[in-house]
Structure formats: structure tokens, C-alpha cells
Amino acid sequence: MKAPPPFYEGDTLDVAKKLLGQKLVHIVDGVKRSGYIVEVEAYKGPDDKAAHSYGGRRTERTEIMFGAPGHAYVYLIYGMYHCFNVITAPVGIPQGVLIRALEPAEGVKEMKLARYGKMELTKTQYKNLTNGPGKLCRALNITLEERGLSLQGDKLYIELVPESQHLSSQYEIVKGPRINIDYAEEAVHYPWRFYFQNNPFISK
């Protein structure tokens, strides 16, 4: 079952925590690639100095953040790595959740080929398959083509995981400062990164 529109509404920190354990799904050439979300970061513009929308900054890139919740915000870092975010909060409030890491679930063969061009991986390579925002986008083939997509469609969406299979039964959810935002002054210290402690696929 897809996460319905109300799932993405409400406080962004709550949505971030709710996303943990759900599946991020991308259908590529008819094949379902998916992973359990094990690490996220919340970004709460316009007051959050780490957010692209800090100060209400509206550009062609950030305009999606001001739109309806439950849409995909994809952008490039270092000109080569894609990052996938889920838009949250009501229209006009530019907030979102960065998906930082996944535990591979379906379409693992295709993910291996997308990341490494081969099927036989070392333990370290497998652990690195989706343990970072750029890595998971490469594995799931999420690019700027998916930017702005509604997560109610049949191509890219969040799939709710039954309680009996949910990773929260195996791992404790913990929080801490976000990663690689040294420029964000006091926002550097906000404990808005949430992850499953000791899950082998978290980014660090």
C-alpha cells in the first residue's frame, strides 16, 4: 500500500520518523527496485539555515519545496550525485526530508549492476550499495527526471510496511545532528537526523 497524501502532512520531524522503516520504491523498465528507509534528515525552511529554502529563497530548483507535500525533490550535489527528498508540510511552507540510506529489498540484482556493473560483490561493496543519498539514487536510478513527481503515482512512491515486517522491531530509532552542513551556523547542531541504530546500511 502506498503512503496516502495525509502521511506527508503535519510536522516535518514527525514525517521524518514515520518514513523510517517504510520502503522507497522506483519502477525502472518494469522492474521494482526498493529499499527500506533506515536513515533520514529533516529540513525545515524557511528558518533552517541548512535548508535550500532558508529565508524563503525561491528559485527554479527550490520551487518544488513550496508546493504540495508528497512530491519528489531531487537535486544534484558536486554536479554528479543525486539526492532524493520527500516534500512535507502544507503548501507554501518549504520543508522536506532527505532520504540518506536504504537497506536493499527488491531489485537487488539491478541495483548491483547500476552501482558496480557486476553481480558478485564483496561484503563491503554490498554494505555500500545504498548507504548514502547519492549511492541510493544511483542504485534505484533516481535522477532529475523524477524531480517533481507525485509519490501517488505508479513509478516512484513510498510503500507502507506492515508492522510485522517493520525494522523498528529490530532497531531503535535514534537522533543526532545532520551530516555535511558545516555552513549552517547554529542549525549544525539541530538533532534532525533520524536513523536505526546499528543498522548495517546507515551512512555513518
Swiss-Prot record:
Keyword S-adenosyl-L-methionine: no
Pfam family, one: Pur_DNA_glyco
Coiled coil region boundaries: none
Gene3D superfamilies per UniProt: Methylpurine-DNA glycosylase (MPG) (3.10.300.10)
GO terms, molecular function: alkylbase DNA N-glycosylase activity; DNA binding
Transmembrane segments: none
Any one GO BP annotation for this protein: base-excision repair
CDD domains linked to this entry: AAG
The enzyme's E.C. designation: 3.2.2.-
Enzyme category, top tier: hydrolase
UniProt keyword terms in alphabetical order: DNA damage, DNA repair, Hydrolase
Similarity section: Belongs to the DNA glycosylase MPG family.
UniProt-recorded name of the protein: Putative 3-methyladenine DNA glycosylase
